[in-house]
Amino acid sequence: RVMKTCKEMGIKTVAIYSEADKNTPFVKFADEAICVGPPPSSESYLLGDKILQICKDLNVDGVHPGYGFLSENADFTRKATDAGITFIGPSPKSMELMGNKLAAKETVKKYGIPMVEGVDEAIVDVEKSLIKAKEIGFPILVKAAAGGGGKGMRVVEKAEEFVEQMNLAISEAESSFGDGSVFIERYVGSPRHIEIQVLADTHGNTVHLFERECSIQRRHQKVIEEAPSVILTP
């Protein structure tokens, strides 16, 4: 969708891809496509410095991160900005506050907004965190602190599965975002996922697009967004 809009506006597009994605539609649709590395994301889509060097070599004006990988990485955003490349997304400061779920929880807590019971810091000792998980009560949701796209998230139904699922979540978060930090929360089954989307540009114009019903998901990733939500009152 981003490239389609760019083409309608007469803006040339460049796609980066791993060897595994060389025949995908977005690669063929772009005006130019550059292979950034082999299939593992740690050797391709997470190589921020390499991606920025490609931008410089091709005189790219702006970079759109898509979702997952480096899309919520404040360090990458700052490096792009410092290199004179427009990052199409939040500022590094905003990303530091909200791109990391633990930092976001800390920010939200200051406003007295209710949150699901859980821990507010990255887990460094898996065995000790099992004690906390038992206090919260199963099922437990293990969540990667960085990134999005449903990566690094595991539902743990019982204590016997906790250590294994924690280690799997840490490994997935590390390979997907380059950051293996995870935390735990009480798992809420069949919740309503409601978002209010806010858009702002560099000129200070801000608009909200009302609420969106995002409860239909697959692997903790939204499949359909419906606006307005049919369950909320005006």
Name each model feature, range by range.
Residues 1-234:
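N-terminal beta-alpha lobe that positions the nucleotide/phosphoryl donor
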